Amino acid sequence: VSIRYDRIERAQALMRDQAIAAIVVMNHDDYRYFFGTDRTQPRGIIPQAGPPALIAFAAEEPDLREAAGGGPVVIFTSVGGQIHDVVTRLREVTAGGGLAATDSLPKVAMQMWFDTPAFLVDLFRTVNPTVELVSSDPIMDPLRAIKEPDELALMAEAQRIAGIGMDRARELLRPDVTAHEVATEALYAMMRAGAERTSTPTYVNFGIDTCMIHGRQSPRPLARGDLAVIDLTPQVEGYCANLARTFVLGEPDERQRELLTTYAELVEAVREAMRPGVTIADLDGRAKEICARHGLGRYQVNGIGHGIGLRFEETPASTIIPPHRNLPLVEGMTVTVGHPVLAIPGFGGARFEDVYRVTSAGGEILWPYSIDPLVEA
């Protein structure tokens, strides 16, 4: 545990501006952002002023007390005791500093995303009727959008490890290999290279299954002439990679070649356009121009990229929250390019995805990896 008090202080300044009494941390990415580590059940409270409170099982107490440097550590001794401790500490926080004396309920923020269990959000509202629960995005998005140098280094390392997994996957592409075998070997290679885990399943799609944007693992073996889409997402110290490549086992036919050429061209065009002030909608427009030029405009899907960092999809989460398509990019953001598959229904699809840092000169790739799609049969 290495508490980032500098980040906590910046969060508290935003909390005061937005009249937020506290942030309740119940998700892995915010916990790691503030506390420098992760736990199976990440729980913490950051008040508008003063030190954070860490909530943990009794056996973890010595380690956390040392890391907290005298700050509060709330210990629970039973599974049911955890929510009681959160509620007790939260009531202490919201009762202080005059926050409870206003006409409206004190506001408590929490991340509302995939990794925050819905049942805990519902339970929290039930046992805390004297507070208003709001999203922590208006606080966390400005803090986490622009990556610090150490964050960029970890993301680049995650991308490097994804490349090791992709190398291993490519080596295995031969007639009759199964997607399960390719996924297993790629995952093993990445874990041996230093990945903690992956942020999504390991996607390996063959043949017609390459039409799916997230097809998990194809049920049938690879055959000569098949397209193969592989998408790898290792994490290093919580930071996510996203590397996708499309291969052809043997010589591509005309339509396959057109798909591959088009996608490679649109990725480069979007990368060059990825500058501060530009939106994902603008980048989608650029991608559509390229697809239309190749006669594939009707197959283009919006959502060419999304934010990425400690969470696999961060703001702008253009593929999940439509208004995010219109958020201007900011220098220093990390964004993927190549998220949607360009697929011809009943035939197959292609995509090349990497992570870039937004700069005034266009997208700066964090770790380059070849897009050569040809694999000898």
Regions found by a protein language model. Name each.
Residues V1-A377:
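Active-site neighborhoods and metal-handling regions in enzymes and metal-associated proteins
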